[in-house]
């Protein structure tokens, strides 16, 4: 089913809306937990839903390699396979393919690479990505693109962006040929170069997509460059389509993305950091394995309503971490996922109440940090 995006309110550049799918409605701005292999690590779908998650991200590349398209089709699709009945967005596999480094070769046709699981030679292109994502039953399909690395010269970024545009057209054409009833998002590339981002936006909007992602950020560039590119690019994207910042990020990155007009985010950070004992709280981050928490009988965050904070102390979580108990990673993950969803709920409420700037000021004050200036404030 084609999604319906309703933009309900703006507060500065911050946007408050909702994505309406057949499988449910997603309030935006929204954060999507990452379920790379068809699971948010250590969590049941019910537990993920209880944290407030409305939509998940799955990984086309990894699910193609394991368990493969045939197994997926035996179950129906990814929703049935993992028992998550809400909406799912899948990335195209491009980022993972390009992360393989020396074991892959990029051509105009697509990417030849060795399967990192068993060493077999395999090939992925725009058409194959569209076919896999149709079999996954993805509610939002991402085009196959090249994620421009950082650093890249202007010429390198230009060639990469132009090839991504050609692949975007191939993705669109094959998506339509397959008669996929769901939704296809374009991905803006161009590195840190504003003129290349302009060309990418123009080309993608001429092809026409159901939503638009900003890709190729959070790949090592300075935060100032990420903010500058976002602030330049977002106003050029269609007002009536959702905007998705891929692979981002820290809580501060989510706030800065919303300040610049982003509606959707995903990142492995809350789950990966949870397994490493880095826990997000109202004032910043707690490193639970530090000895200072051994005798601390208070919860992680008195403001948090998650299962972990309502039932366990820092001392207990420290103990679990020190003993490498699986329960520790699970309780940490529940907390971090809930923190991210509470952050998004607070952002949505602040936009609804026309006090987003006040929210941003308070968010940074709790971290004893200055609010990063917008480009217009620097002028």
UniProtKB/Swiss-Prot annotation:
One GO process term, biological-process aspect: tRNA wobble guanine modification
GO molecular function: metal ion binding; tRNA-guanosine(34) queuine transglycosylase activity
Alphabetical keyword list: Glycosyltransferase, Metal-binding, Queuosine biosynthesis, Transferase, tRNA processing, Zinc
Enzyme Commission numbers on file: 2.4.2.29
Active site (record annotation): 91 (proton acceptor), 266 (nucleophile)
Region (RNA binding): 247-253, 271-275
Source domain of life: Bacteria
SUPFAM superfamilies assigned: tRNA-guanine transglycosylase
Pathway linked to the protein: tRNA modification; tRNA-queuosine biosynthesis
Descriptive protein name: Queuine tRNA-ribosyltransferase
Names of required cofactors: Zn(2+)
Oligomeric and partner information: Homodimer. Within each dimer, one monomer is responsible for RNA recognition and catalysis, while the other monomer binds to the replacement base PreQ1.
Entry note: cofactor: Binds 1 zinc ion per subunit.
Xref: Gene3D superfamilies: Queuine tRNA-ribosyltransferase-like (3.20.20.105)
Residues that coordinate or bind Zn(2+): 304, 306, 309, 335
Record-linked PANTHER family: QUEUINE TRNA-RIBOSYLTRANSFERASE
Gene: tgt
Similarity-based family: Belongs to the queuine tRNA-ribosyltransferase family.
Keyword Transferase: yes
Function: Catalyzes the base-exchange of a guanine (G) residue with the queuine precursor 7-aminomethyl-7-deazaguanine (PreQ1) at position 34 (anticodon wobble position) in tRNAs with GU(N) anticodons (tRNA-Asp, -Asn, -His and -Tyr). Catalysis occurs through a double-displacement mechanism. The nucleophile active site attacks the C1' of nucleotide 34 to detach the guanine base from the RNA, forming a covalent enzyme-RNA intermediate. The proton acceptor active site deprotonates the incoming PreQ1, allowing a nucleophilic attack on the C1' of the ribose to form the product.
Record-linked InterPro entries: ArchSynthase1/Queuine_TRR, TGT, TGT-like_sf, tRNA_ribo_trans-like
């Amino acid at each position: 089913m084609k999604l319906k995006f309703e933009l309900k309110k703006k507060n500065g550049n911050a946007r408050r809306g909702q994505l309406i799918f057949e499988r449910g409605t997603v309030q935006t701005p929204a954060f999507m937990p990452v379920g790379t292999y068809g699971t948010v690590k250590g969590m049941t779908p019910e537990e993920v839903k209880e944290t407030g998650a409305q939509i998940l991200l799955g990984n086309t590349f990894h699910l193609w390699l394991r368990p493969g398209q045939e197994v997926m089709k035996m179950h129906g699709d990814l929703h049935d396979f993992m028992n998550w009945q809400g909406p799912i967005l899948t990335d195209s596999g491009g980022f993972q393919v390009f992360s393989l480094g020396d074991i892959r070769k990029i051509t105009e046709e697509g990417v030849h690479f060795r399967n990192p699981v068993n060493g077999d030679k395999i090939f992925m292109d725009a058409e194959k990505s569209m076919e896999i994502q149709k079999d996954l039953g993805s509610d939002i399909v991402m085009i196959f693109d090249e994620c421009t690395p950082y650093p890249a010269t202007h010429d390198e970024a230009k060639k990469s962006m132009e090839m991504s545009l050609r692949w975007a057209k191939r993705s669109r054409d094959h998506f339509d040929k397959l008669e996929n009833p769901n939704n296809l998002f374009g991905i803006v590339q161009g590195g840190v170069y504003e003129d290349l981002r302009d060309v990418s936006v123009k080309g993608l909007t001429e092809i026409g997509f159901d939503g638009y992602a900003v890709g190729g950020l959070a790949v090592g560039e300075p935060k100032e460059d990420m903010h500058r590119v976002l602030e330049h690019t977002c106003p050029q994207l269609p007002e009536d389509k959702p905007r998705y910042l891929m692979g981002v990020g820290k809580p501060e990155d989510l706030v800065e993305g919303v300040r610049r007009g982003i509606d959707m985010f995903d990142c492995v950070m809350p789950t990966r950091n949870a397994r490493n004992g880095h826990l997000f709280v109202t004032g910043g981050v707690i490193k639970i394995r530090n000895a200072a928490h051994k005798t601390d009988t208070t919860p992680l965050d008195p403001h948090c309503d998650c299962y972990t904070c309502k039932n366990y102390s820092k001392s207990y979580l420290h103990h679990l971490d020190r003993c490498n108990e699986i329960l520790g990673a699970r309780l940490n993950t529940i907390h971090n996922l809930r923190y991210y969803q509470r952050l998004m709920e607070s952002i949505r409420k602040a936009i609804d109440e026309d006090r987003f700037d006040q929210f941003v000021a308070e968010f940074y004050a709790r971290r004893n940090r200055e609010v990063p200036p917008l480009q217009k404030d620097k002028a």
